[in-house]
Amino acid sequence: MKTSRLPIAIQQAVMRRLREKLAQANLKLGRNYPEPKLSYTQRGTSAGTAWLESYEIRLNPVLLLENSEAFIEEVVPHELAHLLVWKHFGRVAPHGKEWKWMMESVLGVPARRTHQFELQSVRRNTFPYSCKCQEHQLTVRRHNRVVRGEAVYRCVHCGEQLVAK
């Protein structure tokens, strides 16, 4: 994977969004939750992750650089919501009703579980598989699970088992 140096302007925009949404949440919840640690160490196809125990948000620098505006608007509040839900409710379903409420009612952001960013630049080796209706690209991890007989994957559209090409 290529590594990227993030321009300071993008890092500042991320911090502005994080602080803005945290202040909004603290005001609406009547709390004073601290600012989480922020790092740009997320890799692979995940845009970001929230680490509850260390109260940290890890963002993918490549996807951030390639999709700055949408990333800052969507991913930063998404991960912050996970931390706020954990602080406010304790351990609950990652994208459950509490998270959805936090996103929509408290942070004022549409509650989307996944991003729609182009992943070609962050995708490592993939392996072609097919079904009746289309070709699929499986990650190295999923491909190895198939090879070892540990997993079977099916198409979400036609339901047929995926077969290596």
UniProtKB/Swiss-Prot annotation:
Pfam families: SprT-like, Zn_ribbon_SprT. Residues 20-163 form the SprT-like domain. One of its GO terms (molecular function) is zinc ion binding. It is found in: Cytoplasm. Zn(2+) binds at H78, H82. GO terms for cellular component: cytoplasm. Its main location: cytoplasm. GO terms for biological process: response to stress. Keywords: Cytoplasm, Metal-binding, Zinc. InterPro entries: SprT-like_domain, SprT_Zn_ribbon, Uncharacterised_SprT. Binds 1 zinc ion. The keyword Cytoplasm applies. The keyword Metal-binding applies. Its cofactor is Zn(2+). The active site is at E79. It comes from the Bacteria. PANTHER family: PROTEIN SPRT. Belongs to the SprT family. This is Protein SprT. It comes from Escherichia coli O157:H7.
